[in-house]
Amino acid sequence: MSGLRPSVVHVTTTDISLELLLGPQLEAFAAAGWNVIGASAPGEHVAALEARGIRHVPVDHLTRSMDPRADLRAARELFRLFKNLKPDVVHTHNPKPGWLGRPAARAARVPAVVNTVHGLYAQPSDGRTLRTMVRVLERGAAACSHAELTQNPEDTATLARWG
């Protein structure tokens, strides 16, 4: 984003994640002089997020459900959003925003793409098909990141095994 302040777009599927889970972090970025934008599907927590001084941009097709057509639309929405905003950083959170947002950010030539793994969708007890799908999606999206952050040692170890 052109201007004097660096800009960061945080991407989640739901506005409640932006407001309740990431709210203090977003406020800290804003207090440090960043232009902070939250991007998610619209919902009832947008007003509370904006009351924190965080701009919200709706991504209508970014939902938790797995719908390939809606997911492609969400990826296009994210690409257009990043092209229009020209942020310095895109930071994705959770599996689906990471799978869609990291490639979209790289395609839009965002200078820094960061992802936080808040947990992996596939567990050892899940079927082989699901575990393989998650691994392929995560590895592909991680190739689009400049930095990958994890919140627990189990996910760090799993991702290291996956390569």
Where are these regions (language model features)?
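N-terminal subdomain of nucleotide-sugar transferases
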Residues: 1-41, 55
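Active-site proximal beta-strand in glycosyltransferases
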Residues: 7-12, 89, 106-120, 138, ...
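Nucleotide-sugar donor phosphate/pyrophosphate-binding loop at the beta->alpha transition
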Residues: 19-22, 69-76, 111-114, 121-144
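Conserved nucleotide-sugar phosphate-binding/catalytic loop shared by glycosyltransferases and other
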Residues: 31-73
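Short beta-strand scaffold positions
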Residues: 40, 91-92, 149-151
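A short, active-site helix/loop in glycosyltransferases that binds the activated sugar's phosphate group
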Residues: 47, 143-163
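An amphipathic, basic-hydrophobic alpha-helix
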Residues: 60-89, 99-107, 132-140
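Short His-centered aromatic/hydrophobic patch
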Residues: 92-98, 117
